[in-house]
Amino acid sequence: MAALTMAACGNKEESSSSKEQAVREAMGDYLVKEIGAHYLQGELCVPTLMIVAGEENGDETQVWCDCWVDWYRVAGDTLKTVSGGNHSGLMTIRMQDGKPVVTAFEQTTDGAGFLPSAKRIFGQHFDVYERMHASQDVRDAARKEQLKEYVSRRGLNVSYYQDYGWDAVEL
């Protein structure tokens, strides 16, 4: 459920995996640049991607997702949350100059319009989205796993993350 799965057959599996990673990177870059820019900024902006479903059609990929964008500041060995929020919806990704780029992001609305917009956007994937979105355990596990990967890839000397008013969580 939390992995973007693209069709792969025979020896195309490796290229499918690298394409999946490239799509995830495009999604993360979009969230940091286009969404993260609207939050109070810290030192690091880290998106958490929870993929509900993905479909490919030629050079276009559609990804239904439940994403979080969080800004952190580094305090010793801890990432302390500065700001952030949830951004659920449908991302459209197209190949441009040989790499995937997010070209559209239709998001759910806040408040009273949330449920109708989520049902419309997620359509046949709504039940999966609803279970994922409603589960704090799923969100916490995805966030922890993806933060751990982020810290490792960048060689940061960080062992914990901490939301304001909560205990630090070990990565």
What do these predicted ranges mean?
Residues Q41, C45, D77-L79, F114-K119, ...:
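General "foldedness" signal
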Residues M1-A2:
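Sec-dependent N-terminal signal peptides
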Residues Q21, K80-S83, D137:
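Soluble non-cytosolic domains of exported or imported proteins
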Residues N11-V69:
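N-terminal export/targeting and maturation segments
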Residues T103-L171:
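Low-complexity, intrinsically disordered terminal/linker segments enriched in charged
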Residues T5-A8:
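C-terminal motif of bacterial Sec signal peptides marking the signal peptidase cleavage site
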Residues P47-A112:
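Mature extracytoplasmic domains of secretory-pathway proteins
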